[in-house]
Amino acid sequence: MANAEVSVPVGDVVVVPTEGNEGENPEDTKTQVILQLQPVQQGIYEAGSENNTAVVAVETHTIHKIEEGIDASTIEANEDMEIAYPITCGESKAILLWKKFVCPGINVKCVKFNDQLISPKHFVHLAGKSTLKDWKRAIRLGGIMLRKMMDSGQIDFYQHDKVCSNTCRSTKFDLLISSARAPVPGQQTSVVQTPTSADGSITQIAISEESMEEAGLEWNSALTAAVTMATEEGVKKDSEEISQDTLMFWKGIADVGLMEEVVCNIQKEIEELLRGVQQRLIQAPFQVTDAAVLNNVAHTFGLMDTVKKVLDNRKNQVEQGEEQFLYTLTDLERQLEEQKKQAQDHRLKSQTVQNVVLMPVSTPKPPKRPRLQRPASTTVLSPSPPVHQPQFTVISPITITPVGQSFSMGNIPVATLSQGSSPVTVHTLPSGPQLFRYATVVSSAKSSSPDTVTIHPSSSLALLSSTAMQDGSTLGNMTTMVSPVELVAMESGLTSAIQAVESTSEDGQTIIEIDPAPDPEAEDTEGKAVILETELRTEEKVVAEMEEHQHQVHNVEIVVLED
């Protein structure tokens, strides 16, 4: 290519003198040749190129001399000639100096615009196309995008095989896996028809349309199997579509005994590739290059179904775990509700017990008045119903002590008690306004045996037995048996009065203490003590006058219960 001839129309060659001294030899003056590209159908691109673009196969050359007699159709060029391409971006026009157009080119000052040398990125910005991320798509050569021409191989960076930043998309299509560069998933790609391989099939190589110069990614040559290889039918892998040459090629490898070695090498390469992806995934976040490698390997070897199967298995496991989690959560909620209910019941029971404990104890009812009870030996005689209660009249004189008040004795019941210790004969008395509550029989102080009987509480004497009196002599006989009696009616607390009366009484006297029951008519006289003194002497006779006497109680034991 050093002495290649460029065949272009005469009017399409523009010679631009470069900066130099005017006095120098014109033959040594460097010139710039601006090539107007024309459609060329040539060589191996005839089968796949239908875009009518020209193939540039020119390096930097210098015209040795230009003479008037030399035909312009044949220009001999050398390395001193500088080639420039007219480019456009929107409405702006500039010249791309190819010798300065080195990889990666985005920030390299290789565009001459308004007599200024600027970078392609700056040129796109001045042209108002800065919104486009890919500067190669914004710049056009002869109406064709610069990227498309570079992908098709019509133009490339200057000395790209020697100077490469590894941040570009190489347009040198090396079919060797070690030198292949992987595209980034998700970017627009264009399919470029490459030369026919040895087996006669046409290989499609997916080239990304998105530039990676700005991203600054460094593509490692170890990322093998990054280029998706397919037949012209796409991803069909049926053995029927394999050409005869390909079949013979692999059959020859098997015949010479290299198949095992080839398979082992391929396996090692793939394992190293995947191992590198795993190591990078541990050390750093997942990168775009790793995603590209995995995607290409999966598609190349048809492993997408395996990947989907793994995803389905994980999805099923997650769903089962979610169901188990929901079941456990429901069971825990149920247990929580039961515990809350039990705690509430326990709290109610505790409150009830506390209320019972703190409840004030009710005061016991006052004891009832003791009742007279008859012993088992007591003989109860069933009396005939009396027509009238017997009336007894005391004929003997009754004297009243000064401390008392005089009152009528007509309605006072009188009891004739025996002085003996036991039994005591009690005659029935008529009911009246005053009832005996307490009766005390006090014997003489000189008596050897105590003859004191206390009858209480405040209840009238019960009639235990009664017998009809035969005649009045019985009452007289009983009267003769009674020693002089003093009747004392007093309230509780006046015990001293009883003692005084007892001390002043004569020998053989009997004192009866009478506490009358409450009388509504006698409320105004409450609190007054009345002492009734009756002296019954042995020589006096008591005559009992009664209209009817049918009942009599004698020889009766009186049992008194105290509180």
Swiss-Prot record:
Superkingdom of source: Eukaryota
Family matches, as InterPro entries: SAND-like_dom_sf (IPR010919), SAND_dom (IPR000770)
One Gene Ontology biological process: regulation of transcription by RNA polymerase II
Subcellular location: Nucleus; Cytoplasm
Residues at which Zn(2+) binds: 103, 160, 164, 168
Any GO CC annotation of this UniProt entry: nucleus
UniProt name for this protein: Glucocorticoid modulatory element-binding protein 1
